[in-house]
Amino acid sequence: MKSNEIKGDNRYTSMESLVRGIFMELITSKVLDVCSGIGRLMLENGAETYRVEDTVYRVAVNYGMQGVSVFSVPTALIITVQDQTGQEYTRLHRVTELKSNLGIVSEANTLSRKIAAHELSPNDALNEIDILNRKEPTYSPVEEILAAGLICAFFTILFLGSFADLIAAGILGAVGYAVFLYSLKVINIRFFSELIASFAIAWLAVFLRFLGIGDDINIIILSSVMTLVPGKAITNGIRDLMASHFISGVSVLADALLTAGAIGVGVATVFSII
């Protein structure tokens, strides 16, 4: 009789352990979904890798995970956590689409602060992440093109250009950015899109100068390509290097160097032709 009771207790204990293990695995999987979702949002939209790692780490810890380890580069995110039983789980997420939307980065940071304040469960956080993933771009292509023209126009003031240079740079900045967006959509290779856009800007600058529009062609071209200059990439690369994230820092700076090279080649090609 006692033997049967012991066997029954053992079965009950093993069943309880199995249920607890399945429950912990489900919870940990949800937490990893939240961590990888927030990290991917930040990486895709231009956040620095050290900021991504810090945010993902804090999210995992605030959800009760132990032994949290996060590693990110501009195109990948690796997260390892331990549940309360010591079981390790790892999630690898590949980032293929890189763009610049600091508004999404800010909203992802706000989401992580809500998690730190214990305002969101993993399911609620996943719903918020899904909303951010489906969010439409803040500005339309037409608005971006007009903004690019204004930015380039006012750069002529910084470079001590004339009012005629301001008008020419505004026109070329808008046209050049439109060429960049169109070629990026067709070719889907950023390097060639920037090369084509800078070539178009330099060629049109020569044409406008031939028509008597603008005074200093150097200031016009320099101002018109400013929206193509990888300022954010250079800043992020230097900040990653300063934070000892050497792999991501060097890769981001290499991308910025390629972009600068594409702009230079596009402009130099026009001057070599004329």
Language-model features, listed with the residues they occupy:
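Generic detector of multi-pass transmembrane helix bundles and their immediately adjacent loops
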Residues: 210-274
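Cytosolic juxtamembrane amphipathic/interface segments immediately preceding
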Residues: 128-137, 247
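Core alpha-helical transmembrane segments of integral membrane proteins
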Residues: 137-211
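Alpha-helical transmembrane segments and immediately membrane-proximal extracytoplasmic
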Residues: 88-100, 138-139, 143-145, 252, ...
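Short, flexible active-site-proximal loops enriched in glycine and acidic residues
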Residues: 116-125, 139-145
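Soluble N-terminal domains of membrane-associated systems
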Residues: 9-120
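Intrinsic disorder
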Residues: 3-4
